[in-house]
């Protein structure tokens, strides 16, 4: 994860801003510079290589002192930065919006995947600039639309029916922020279209998950798609989701947390996120991840796609 200010800076033109990508050498210069505390939040002028990110974001980059950041010297950083700028320059960003836009934290791996989709001549994003920009605006939180299959970050497709597409995420092969744990395996499920889904197609997906992925939990980060993760990583996902939800609420970024279909989501995760939305503490919510839930005999009998979040969330409280 990284702020958009780690990739580009704004230049005022008339009544709106044009965004310009950083280059590797400007970032490297900023990382070696000694900057006063009062200037940590200002864009850094490298003199030789142009503008660089504010020094307060140094930890977002991989250095000798910090191996968890982005590999900023790889060409992929420039590709991601250019893609972000193209998307932001396709809309109007005013002076009242620019600070909020640049402070937004985005998924670096998601954006690298969009670059890979853009470069794949067999992919629809290679052929459609409009769809590509739409995908980026969704990825950086500048669009309220959900990530559907056409605008998804991509990966290796392992299952598809009329309503859903399931992707195996390819973060191990990334250049900018690769997953270093070789045992990492995670999937994402996107809806092919943002519209009501028939029980038949939901049942097909659930059958696939139960037979092929019974060692994984189906969860959501509230953004309109499903994640299929190892049970051992669920607690880590819970910490991240809770922190993001609270930070958004604190900063005034009111984003609706989409609980998705209760029949697909792992019961304990549905209980966790439902309780989180009701304002319970992290400790109370996380207890629900480790409680035994009563399984409904037939989740399809008499059920619609309507959410019933309040019923589950108070179990064990």
UniProtKB/Swiss-Prot annotation:
Q: Which InterPro entries match?
A: Rota_NS35_C (IPR048306), Rota_NS35_N (IPR048573), Rotavirus_NSP2 (IPR003668), Rotavirus_NSP2_C (IPR024076), Rotavirus_NSP2_N (IPR024068)
Q: Which GO terms describe its biological process?
A: viral genome replication
Q: Where is this region: RNA-binding?
A: 205-241
- One example GO MF annotation: ribonucleoside triphosphate phosphatase activity
SUPFAM superfamilies attached to this UniProt entry:
Rotavirus NSP2 fragment, C-terminal domain, Rotavirus NSP2 fragment, N-terminal domain
Give a yes or no for keyword RNA-binding in this entry.
yes
Residues that bind ATP, according to the entry? 107-109, 188, 221-223, 227
Biological role stated in the UniProt entry = Participates in replication and packaging of the viral genome. Plays a crucial role, together with NSP5, in the formation of virus factories (viroplasms), which are large inclusions in the host cytoplasm where replication intermediates are assembled and viral RNA replication takes place. Displays ssRNA binding, NTPase, RNA triphosphatase (RTPase) and ATP-independent helix-unwinding activities. The unwinding activity may prepare and organize plus-strand RNAs for packaging and replication by removing interfering secondary structures.
Tell me its family.
Belongs to the rotavirus NSP2 family.
Annotated protein name in UniProt: Non-structural protein 2
Q: Which organism is it from?
A: Rotavirus A (strain RVA/Human/Japan/KU/1995/G1P1A[8])
Origin organism lineage: Viruses, Riboviria, Orthornavirae, Duplornaviricota, Resentoviricetes
């Amino acid at each position: 994860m990284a702020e958009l200010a780690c990739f580009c800076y704004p230049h005022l033109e008339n009544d709106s801003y044009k965004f310009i990508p950083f280059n590797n050498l400007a970032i490297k210069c900023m990382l070696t510079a000694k900057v006063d505390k009062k200037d940590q939040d200002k864009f850094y002028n490298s003199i030789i290589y142009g503008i660089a990110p504010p020094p307060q974001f140094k930890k977002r980059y991989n250095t000798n002192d910090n191996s968890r950041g982005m590999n900023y010297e790889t060409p992929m950083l420039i590709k991601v930065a250019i893609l972000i700028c193209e998307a932001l320059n396709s809309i109007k960003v005013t002076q009242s919006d620019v600070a909020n836009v640049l402070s937004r934290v985005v998924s670096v791996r998601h954006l690298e995947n969009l670059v890979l989709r853009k470069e794949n001549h067999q992919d629809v994003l290679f052929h459609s600039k409009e769809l590509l920009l739409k995908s980026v605006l969704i990825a950086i939180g500048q669009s309220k639309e959900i990530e559907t299959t056409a605008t998804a970050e991509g990966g290796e497709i392992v299952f598809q029916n009329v309503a859903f597409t399931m992707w195996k995420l390819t973060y191990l092969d990334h250049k900018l922020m690769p997953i270093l744990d070789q045992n990492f395996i995670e999937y994402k499920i996107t809806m092919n279209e943002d519209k009501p889904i028939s029980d038949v197609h939901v049942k097909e997906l659930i059958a696939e998950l139960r037979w092929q992925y019974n060692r994984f939990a189906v969860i959501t980060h509230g953004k309109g798609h499903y994640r299929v993760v190892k049970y051992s990583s669920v607690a880590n996902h819970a910490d991240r989701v809770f922190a993001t939800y609270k930070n958004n609420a604190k900063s005034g970024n009111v984003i609706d947390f989409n609980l998705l279909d209760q029949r697909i989501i792992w019961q304990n995760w549905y209980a966790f996120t439902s309780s989180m939305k009701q304002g319970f503490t992290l400790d109370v919510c996380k207890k629900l991840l480790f409680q035994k839930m009563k399984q409904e005999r037939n989740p399809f009998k008499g059920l619609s796609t309507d959410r019933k979040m309040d019923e589950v969330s108070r179990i064990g409280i």
